[in-house]
Amino acid sequence: MGEKKNEGDNKKKGGDNKKKNETPSITVVLKVDMHCEGCASRIVKCVRSFQGVETVKSESATGKLTVTGALDPVKLREKLEEKTKKKVDLVSPQPKKEKEKENKNKNDEDKKKSEEKKKPDNNDKKPKETPVTTAVLKLNFHCQGCIGKIQKTVTKTKGVNGLTMDKEKNLLTVKGTMDVKKLVEILSEKLKRAVEIVPPKKEKDKENGNENGEKKKGGGGDGGGKEKTGNKGGGEGVNMMEYMAAQPAYGYGYYPGGPYGYPIQAHAPQIFSDENPNACVVM
């Protein structure tokens, strides 16, 4: 009887030790850049190869990767970064050390703020607040991965408050106190494509209005010049008819020649002839 009791106690102890050694399954949420379905399938295969992984779900649109199983989330993140050579963010659960660091940083920031408030301001002048601007950018959206990359780069830039995307027109509207030129440079470097700043409609309307005004002013000046030239002639200038005077023509005129004739044989005049009895006599 004593031996049977000892065997039962040993079995219970062994079962308790197994339960203690087994780590409970947890849900780990990671954030990775997944450009397309091919990238997502590769990352899922890589995660499934790790020990303790039970299920893996990927969302390529948001770059979210959900993993369940008995595993260490920090080690999983580090190994995934090594294999994929991409930045992997651990959304949940956060390790205790990182939480403690965040709490310390928050406390330090609060202390600094309180000290700054206590210090007297040497300059009473307040710094000028940068105005909130709205910039419209034009660039090509190739696929869902490109859209996610654009959203990530824009949200990381300093001073951006919000953004909206128009996929049909390929327009990106950004609101905030950021430097638009720097934002354009960052996007063109990371995406390796042309990014244009679309000017607002008001500026275009003003430019068109100025051009029309200049044309009207120029036409009025010409009309004024014509009126001045007409007034110099007085009242006669109004009723004066304009005509083109014909230039004098110089030509070489020849009289028409007579018809061609033949010599006619006629008798010589008999007025002073001696043979004519009726002729005149010169004394």
Swiss-Prot record:
Location of region: Disordered: 1-26, 82-131, 198-238
PANTHER family for this protein: HEAVY METAL-ASSOCIATED ISOPRENYLATED PLANT PROTEIN 3 (PTHR46413:SF2), HEAVY METAL-ASSOCIATED ISOPRENYLATED PLANT PROTEIN 6 (PTHR46413)
Function: Heavy-metal-binding protein. Binds high amounts of zinc. May act as an upstream regulator of the salicylate-dependent pathogen response. Involved in abiotic stress responses, and seed and flower development.
Subcellular localization: Nucleus; Nucleus, Nucleolus; Cytoplasm
InterPro entries: HIPP01/3/5/6, HMA_dom, HMA_dom_sf
One Pfam family linked to the record: HMA
Main location: nucleus
SUPFAM superfamilies linked: HMA, heavy metal-associated domain (SSF55008)
Listed GO biological process terms: negative regulation of flower development
GO cellular component, one term: cytoplasm
Species whose genome carries this gene: Arabidopsis thaliana (Mouse-ear cress)
Residues bound to Zn(2+) 1: 36, 39
The protein's name: Heavy metal-associated isoprenylated plant protein 3
Keywords assigned: Cytoplasm, Lipoprotein, Metal-binding, Methylation, Nucleus, Prenylation, Repeat, Zinc
Note: Plants over-expressing HIPP3 show delayed growth of inflorescence.
Effect of residue 39 to G: Loss of zinc binding; in association with C-36; C-143 and C-146
Induction section of the entry: Induced by infection with the bacterial pathogen P.syringae pv. tomato DC3000. Repressed in response to drought and abscisic acid (ABA).
S-farnesyl cysteine-type lipidated residues: 280
Propeptide residues, chain positions: 281-283
Compositionally biased region (Basic and acidic residues): 1-22, 82-129, 198-230
Family: Belongs to the HIPP family.
Record domain HMA: where: 25-88, 132-195
Binding site for Zn(2+) 2: 143, 146
Modified residues (Cysteine methyl ester): 280
GO molecular function, one term: zinc ion binding
